[in-house]
Regions:
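ER/Golgi luminal nucleotide-sugar-dependent glycosyltransferases, focusing on the catalytic module
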Residues: 1-119
Length: 119
């Protein structure tokens, strides 16, 4: 819970919608005031299709219940490396596309960190 609270604090004042499978960890208190739990979460875990169902349930709940311009799926390890105000200014800027990329084959640190997701 502490890592999710840390992520929510970093993203404040924006709403952080959390899908948590309480059968995996029943005691999961979050203190950040901007956290909302997805109601009736599905069972998740490795080799369980519920992980995908949990993502879709979260997206459906967000679309039905929240008012937002941008939505990003995150895990607790996705802590921002720059202030939210800087990201907000960039996203609201005049650029037509908000996309950045890293040449994984040229950046060995990036290749070791996230390369398995690409190959």
């Amino acid at each position: 819970p502490a890592v999710v609270d840390q992520l929510a604090d970093a993203l404040a004042p924006h709403t952080v919608l959390v899908h948590h499978d309480f059968t995996q960890q029943a005691d999961f208190p979050l203190k950040a005031p901007n956290v909302r739990f997805v109601p009736n979460p599905v069972r998740t875990g490795w080799a369980v299709f519920g992980f995908v169902e949990g993502i879709f349930l979260t997206l459906r709940h967000a679309l039905a219940e929240l008012d937002f311009d941008y939505l990003q799926l995150l895990s607790p390890s996705c802590l921002p490396i720059k202030p939210m105000a800087q990201f907000e200014a960039h996203a609201m800027g005049s650029a037509l596309a908000h996309f950045d990329c890293i040449d994984l084959l040229a950046d060995h640190d990036a290749l070791m960190s996230v390369g398995y997701r690409a190959f």
